[in-house]
UniProtKB/Swiss-Prot annotation:
Residue numbers of S-glutathionyl cysteine PTMs: 139
Modified residues (N6-acetyllysine): 148
Naturally occurring in which organism (per UniProt): Homo sapiens (Human)
Secretion signal, residue range per the UniProt entry: none
Family under the similarity heading: Belongs to the glyoxalase I family.
GO terms, biological process: carbohydrate metabolic process; glutathione metabolic process; methylglyoxal metabolic process; negative regulation of apoptotic process; osteoclast differentiation; regulation of transcription by RNA polymerase II
Modified residues (Phosphothreonine): 107
N-acetylalanine carried by residues: 2
Residues binding Zn(2+), per UniProt: 34, 100, 127, 173
Requisite cofactors: Zn(2+)
Ligase found in the keyword field: no
Protein name as catalogued: Lactoylglutathione lyase
Consequence recorded when altering residue 102 to A: No effect on phosphorylation
Amino acid sequence: MAEPQPPSGGLTDEAALSCCSDADPSTKDFLLQQTMLRVKDPKKSLDFYTRVLGMTLIQKCDFPIMKFSLYFLAYEDKNDIPKEKDEKIAWALSRKATLELTHNWGTEDDETQSYHNGNSDPRGFGHIGIAVPDVYSACKRFEELGVKFVKKPDDGKMKGLAFIQDPDGYWIEILNPNKMATLM
């Protein structure tokens, strides 16, 4: 007999839990440290993520032989960033949920260069999410800054959350964690 499915056709809560294992004790100090997005123009991306979303550049790494740079951003106080190079790198790579922007040198000057955001065929990567105290206030500010919206807070069936796009077209969900229970 087939297992009952929720209305969505996805896994039931029980089925989802049955697919999961308890964490091995050896993984107790693991953490999700970063997600990486390739960017065409680091100047535009750094401006967007710092000025528009309020993130802090916590580490920059250049790889001249391979012709690329990494920019790590997080919601951290810039005064907490260590000054000494090795300590700064270790500190940056021990933060939770950082955003790594990878820039392959020269893409900013190539008019044919673009990256797939995963939200059109073939679908894949979807979005990152930013928690904010007030979605409507944040979106009002984004509108004033000329940010491109995929979905405004009152559009569609899921009210109270929004999706914006960064300079490369990646989607960013804007949500209030305390309000999400009414949507899920």
